[in-house]
Curated annotation (Swiss-Prot):
Organism: Mus musculus (Mouse)
Residue ranges, compositional bias (Basic and acidic residues): 182-202
CDD domains named in the record: WH2_WAVE-1
Positions of post-translational Omega-N-methylarginine modification: 341
Entry's family note: Belongs to the SCAR/WAVE family.
Domain notes: Binds the Arp2/3 complex through the C-terminal region and actin through verprolin homology (VPH) domain.
Residues recorded as bearing Asymmetric dimethylarginine in the entry: 341
Localization, UniProt: Cytoplasm, Cytoskeleton; Synapse; Cell junction, Focal adhesion
Protein name, as recorded: Actin-binding protein WASF1
UniProt region (Disordered), positions on chain: 170-202, 273-400, 412-491
Length: 559
């Protein structure tokens, strides 16, 4: 509805009741009408003064702004036209440190505030009736709301609009955050190859060469891809042979010796520089030699390499000798010739097989479940190592050897004196783990590293009357495998000064976090009844990707 700013009184000139006792009514009405006209003229003159006074104030402020702008233009024109760089030196610091001009535009808002209320409207407001004094009941309310707002609330509609605008702004910010997170979680799309333009001339040239010499469409597409993305990398095109399937059903260990030699000869002829020369014979190691270097065929390359086996490698190396192997050195009776031949020619077992019962010649633990099978390894593979230092919680025990493929020490009982005499004197031979476990299998490593608790490892003895059985060590002398080793703490004791410093640092971080949260909350509290600020805030959120006040995401690293 239209808002009447100025009301001219009286509105009706002749609408007056004549008093009784007046004889000349026409003269009375004329005088009343003239008086009302004079009152209207006085109201017009008063409002004219207000209107022209407002116009004068606006013109004065406008002239002041124009004069200040003219003075700035005059100063700039003088400095531009009359500046002589030879006489007056300009420092680069003055030019760079000077702030750029920034105009301050004051928007007209809060037009209906008490301070900006015009005088005619103030007079009209004063004429209105006062609302009931409901503010007297405000101190007696528990919710803290003003009692008069339940009767009349001029800011109700503005508060409703403000709440809706702020909620829309927050919803848009959350949607942007979700979209950004979705873009981060989405996998990177491959680059699309642009489609080659349709060239009829190339097609006619391809047909002109004949069907035999015409290039295939796949070759043309490959050329276009090379032009767009650069030359393709070189891929290995070697044939897939038995060497590529070491762990499958076509393992080298499952082949006869004649086929194995033929396959190795072909590999040498394809790889070596001098293919006609025979391969070098394997080094002959005696019973006392240590650290032999086996010939290893890698399943990843299919080539012959002379390098030691590494248990951490991802390949499955197979030990193959190009010539018939020499007679093996004397072994303990735990590894018989039949078990050695079975380990050289049989296929490797699956990764986690059920523990098979040990053979008749192998060791067995009486009155306990059968332990894992012993390790079946070719002669000369295990590297004897010096005995490690025994832990302080266990009584001194015989030296323990360490296997090269398995990076764990297995405490077992030493061999009898009769078996030790046939081995090199300086380091004792490596005792062999239970049968059926491969050194490269992770299950074997876990089994060797953590033997079953409550079970003692079986002593490695040879069947015969001259080999006495050693009694198992008492339980008090054996440390359980599941119990971790306890070492004295070597960390320095934190003094009171350091603890106070750490506490101060924590408090400082907490204070900084709380301070930044208060700054973020202050940003929300600054939004008062300012329409321009609310609208500009919403526009900034819609058309920008910044999330300055996004639920304190920037202080998560302090937690």
């Amino acid at each position: 509805m239209p808002l009447v700013k100025r009301n001219i009184d009286p509105r009706h000139l002749c609408h007056t009741a004549l008093p009784r006792g007046i004889k000349n009514e026409l003269e009375c009405v004329t005088n009343i009408s003239l008086a009302n006209i004079i009152r209207q003229l006085s109201s017009l003159s008063k409002y004219a003064e207000d209107i022209f006074g407002e116009l004068f104030n606006e013109a004065h402020s406008f002239s002041f702004r124009v004069n200040s702008l003219q003075e700035r233009v005059d100063r700039l024109s003088v400095s531009v036209t009359q500046l002589d760089p030879k006489e007056e030196e300009l420092s680069l610091q003055d030019i760079t440190m000077r702030k750029a001009f920034r105009s301050s535009t004051i928007q007209d808002q809060q037009l209906f505030d008490r301070k900006t209320l015009p005088i005619p409207l103030q007079e009209t407001y004063d004429v209105c009736e006062q609302p009931p004094p409901l503010n007297i009941l405000t101190p007696y309310r528990d919710d803290g709301k003003e009692g008069l707002k339940f009767y009349t609330n001029p800011s109700y509609f503005f508060d409703l609009w403000k709440e809706k605008m702020l909620q829309d702004t927050e919803d848009k910010r959350k949607e942007k955050r979700k979209q950004k997170q979705k873009n981060l979680d989405r996998p990177h799309e491959p680059e699309k190859v642009p489609r080659a333009p349709h060239d009829r001339r190339r097609e006619w040239q391809k047909l002109a060469q004949g069907p035999e010499l015409a290039e295939d469409d796949a070759d043309l597409l490959h050329k276009h891809i090379e032009v767009a993305n650069g030359p393709a990398s070189h891929y290995e095109t070697r044939p897939q042979t038995y060497v590529d399937h070491m762990d499958g059903s076509y393992s080298l260990s499952a082949l006869p010796f004649s086929q194995m030699s033929e396959l190795l000869t072909r590999a040498e002829e394809r790889v070596l520089v001098r293919p006609h020369e025979p391969p070098p014979p394997p080094p002959m190691h005696g019973a006392g030699d240590a650290k032999p270097t086996p010939t290893c065929i890698s399943s990843a390359t299919g080539l012959i390499e002379n390098r030691p086996q590494s248990p951490a490698a991802g390949r499955t190396p197979v030990f193959v000798s190009p010539t018939p192997p020499p007679p093996p050195p004397p072994l303990p009776s735990a590894l018989s010739t039949s078990s050695l031949r079975a380990s050289m020619t049989s296929t490797p077992p699956p990764p986690v097989p059920p523990p098979p019962p040990p053979p008749a010649t192998a060791l067995q633990a009486p009155a306990v479940p059968p332990p894992p099978a012993p390790l079946q390894i070719a002669p000369g593979v295990l590297h004897p190592a010096p005995p490690p230092i025994a832990p302080p919680l266990v009584q001194p025990s015989p030296p323990v050897a360490r296997a090269a493929p398995v990076c764990e020490t297995v405490p077992v009982h030493p061999l009898p004196q009769g078996e030790v005499q046939g081995l090199p004197p300086p380091p004792p031979p490596p005792p062999l783990p239970p049968p059926g476990i491969r050194p490269s299998s992770p299950v074997a490593v876990a089994a060797l590293a953590h033997p079953p608790s409550g079970l003692h490892p079986a002593p490695s003895t040879a069947p015969g009357p001259h080999a006495p059985l050693m009694p198992p060590s008492p339980p008090s002398q054996v440390l359980p495998a599941s119990e971790p080793k306890r070492h004295p703490s070597t960390l320095p004791v934190i003094s009171d000064a350091r603890s106070v410093l750490l506490e101060a640092i924590r408090k400082g971080i907490q204070l900084r976090k709380v301070e930044e949260q208060r700054e973020q909350e202050a940003k929300h509290e600054r939004i008062e009844n300012d329409v321009a600020t609310i609208l500009s805030r919403r526009i900034a959120v819609e058309y920008s990707d910044s999330e300055d006040d996004s639920e304190f995401d920037e202080v998560d690293w302090l937690e």
